[in-house]
């Protein structure tokens, strides 16, 4: 596999070069390669002969998690990243669903699985039992599953998305070829490894001999500590959710002076607000900003566009860009008919980035994946349209609501609320205590203003909204907060916000 070959090349040529760095840890390419060889050998000794069962890797962004990932795939087994924030009950469901035989505990914490179905070891124990003489014939390759990431399932049980070596290689090659991320760059890693956004920085960094700079959850929760670490990081490539960079932008000190070597910002995981992109262009004049889009089921991202001043000026909602060159993206109606440019429907993604399906879930796989025009395709469940080759994503189809007979998109309303001069960021929540939606609530982090009372601020925002939205789409209730809650993955936590504002 090209990715593993590239890591081996850097380990041989520059064994002392840093592959991983955080405030507390460092790992060279030589150490990464040697330790992962030993872990791979140890995995083979601790599992049944010929077994290809997945390996769970439990921890929080430690270097030995990446050692364990590589060790797993060198031993011919896919890995399943499990962050320490994931509840024990969910971990048990993942073990039962995946058939995993081995859990590598990197964090040092005890993992209460309540199950004798899985053996728990540390990477140090595996490395001590293993050796560095492992045949590359064992490596995961081509259609073999490289990693499995578990996402939320509508049944209440997590679904394991299988990403093959070919899926990952196609994605990594695209990032390294079509984005300005040349050899030896320092990449930010903000996303926990159980969130597939982390794949956007881990593997392009390793394939180009770069350094992965990890910022852990405890640093993110302390802005002063976070900014001190960022200042020392020498970051070139920033990858994160828009929500995370928006949180950083709330501090006026988040500028090119803090990150003088920042060259590119890459976003994925949720919609990039135009105001956030504009602020980045203002504060980081030497950096380029890219918006990308893609579900976990299509290997992180399958579209991209560089966000320029012209694109911001011409679009109320930013495009997610053009399809990855080897992918086909089109829009379908509910009857499976392809729609022409400009017509809104479901975004369908086809090509070599599409997952083979959900592990052990043939019925769910059959509903979400299908063959079309000789390619494997995926129903995203996202609404959107294509205009002049560019894809515009308009949120989840299931984010559509009906209010007093009117069908509307919550994310469309959020775009307009966020455009108010008085709003820093906002989330719109439907109030539906007994089934039907009764009205909308806007949870807002306001900009600095001169109003003495909240009702005066609300009136000013509503007046602005009235110029762009029909009355029935304007939220009835406005709640003001000092920040918007985020999930452990760095996305807006809509469920938690809803629970708070609906109390």
Curated annotation (Swiss-Prot):
Its main location: cytoplasm. The keyword Iron-sulfur does not apply. ATP binds at residues 151-152, 291-296, 382, 491. One of its GO terms (cellular component) is cytoplasm. SUPFAM superfamilies: Acetyl-CoA synthetase-like (SSF56801). It comes from the Bacteria. InterPro entries: AA_adenyl_dom, AMP-bd_C, AMP-bd_C_sf, AMP-binding_CS, AMP-dep_synth/lig_dom, ANL_N_sf, DltA, DltA-like. PANTHER family: ENZYME, PUTATIVE (JCVI)-RELATED, PTHR45398. Belongs to the ATP-dependent AMP-binding enzyme family. DltA subfamily. This is D-alanine--D-alanyl carrier protein ligase. It comes from Bacillus velezensis (strain DSM 23117 / BGSC 10A6 / LMG 26770 / FZB42) (Bacillus amyloliquefaciens subsp. plantarum).
């Amino acid at each position: 596999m090209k990715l593993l070959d590239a890591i081996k090349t850097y380990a041989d040529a520059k064994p002392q070069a840093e592959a991983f760095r955080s405030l507390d840890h460092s790992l060279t390419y030589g150490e990464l390669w040697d330790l992962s060889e030993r872990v791979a050998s140890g995995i083979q000794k601790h599992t049944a002969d010929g077994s290809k069962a997945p390996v769970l890797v439990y921890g929080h962004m430690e270097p030995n998690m990446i050692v364990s990932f590589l060790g797993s795939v060198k031993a011919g087994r896919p890995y399943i990243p499990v962050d320490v924030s994931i509840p024990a009950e969910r971990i048990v469901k993942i073990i039962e669903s995946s058939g995993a035989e081995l859990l590598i505990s990197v964090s040092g914490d005890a993992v209460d699985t309540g199950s004798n179905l899985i053996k728990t070891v540390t990477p140090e124990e595996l490395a001590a039992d293993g050796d560095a003489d492992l045949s590359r014939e064992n490596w995961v390759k081509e259609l073999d599953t490289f990693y499995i990431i578990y996402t939320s399932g509508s049944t209440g049980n997590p679904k394991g998305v299988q990403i093959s070596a070919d899926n990952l290689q196609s994605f990594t090659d695209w990032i390294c070829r079509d984005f300005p991320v040349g050899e030896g760059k320092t990449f930010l890693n903000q996303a926990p490894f159980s969130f597939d956004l982390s794949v956007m920085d881990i593997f392009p960094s390793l394939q180009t001999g770069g350094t992965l700079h990890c910022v852990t959850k405890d640093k993110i929760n302390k802005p002063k500590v976070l900014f001190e670490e960022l200042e020392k990081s020498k970051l070139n490539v920033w990858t994160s959710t828009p929500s995370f960079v928006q949180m950083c932008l709330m501090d006026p000190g988040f500028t090119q002076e803090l990150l003088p070597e920042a060259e590119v910002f890459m976003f994925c995981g949720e919609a990039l607000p135009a105001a956030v992109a504009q602020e980045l262009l203002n504060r980081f004049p030497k950096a380029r900003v890219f918006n990308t889009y893609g579900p976990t089921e299509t290997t992180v991202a399958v579209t991209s566009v560089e966000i320029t001043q012209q694109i911001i000026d011409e679009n109320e909602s930013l495009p997610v860009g053009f399809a990855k060159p080897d992918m086909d993206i089109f829009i379908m109606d509910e009857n499976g008919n392809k729609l022409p440019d400009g017509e809104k429907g479901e975004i369908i993604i086809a090509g070599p980035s599409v997952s083979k399906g959900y592990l052990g879930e043939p019925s769910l796989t059959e509903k979400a994946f299908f063959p079309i025009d000789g390619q494997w395709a995926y129903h995203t469940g996202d609404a959107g349209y294509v205009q002049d080759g560019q894809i515009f994503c308009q949120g989840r189809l299931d984010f559509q609501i009906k209010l007093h007979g009117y069908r509307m998109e919550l994310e469309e309303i959020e775009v307009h609320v966020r455009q108010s001069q008085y709003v820093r960021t906002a989330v719109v929540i439907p109030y539906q205590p007994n089934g039907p939606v009764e009205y909308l609530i806007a949870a807002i982090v306001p900009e600095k203003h001169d109003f003495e009372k909240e009702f005066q601020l609300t009136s000013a925002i509503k007046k602005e909204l009235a110029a762009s939205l029909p009355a029935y789409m304007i939220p009835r209730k406005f709640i003001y907060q000092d920040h918007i809650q985020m999930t452990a993955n760095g996305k807006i936590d809509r469920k938690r916000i809803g629970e708070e504002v609906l109390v």
